[in-house]
């Protein structure tokens, strides 16, 4: 699976999800906190640069293996 770079559009810590805007201009991708690859509290900040893979979830594409850049 290829890695894609993008920026966090928004992330709601209390709900544990948000969206990432890919750098290639494609449609925003859903991200769940469980896909964030970090220790401790898993969260993302608006505008943060990330790298991720896209998987096909039940409700459409979602981010997997999200890492901060």
UniProtKB/Swiss-Prot annotation:
Gene3D superfamilies: 6.20.370.130, Nucleic acid-binding proteins. It holds the Pfam family CSD. It is found in: Cytoplasm. The keyword Chaperone does not apply. InterPro entries: Cold_shock_CspA, Cold_shock_domain, CSD, CSD_CS, CSP_DNA-bd, NA-bd_OB-fold. One of its GO terms (cellular component) is cytosol. Keywords: Activator, Cytoplasm, DNA-binding, Transcription, Transcription regulation. Its main location: cytoplasm. Residues 6-66 form the CSD domain. GO terms for molecular function: DNA binding. It comes from the Bacteria. The keyword Magnesium does not apply. CDD domains: CSP_CDS. This is Cold shock-like protein CspE. It comes from Buchnera aphidicola subsp. Acyrthosiphon pisum (strain APS). The lineage of its organism: Bacteria, Pseudomonadati, Pseudomonadota, Gammaproteobacteria, Enterobacterales. The gene is cspE.
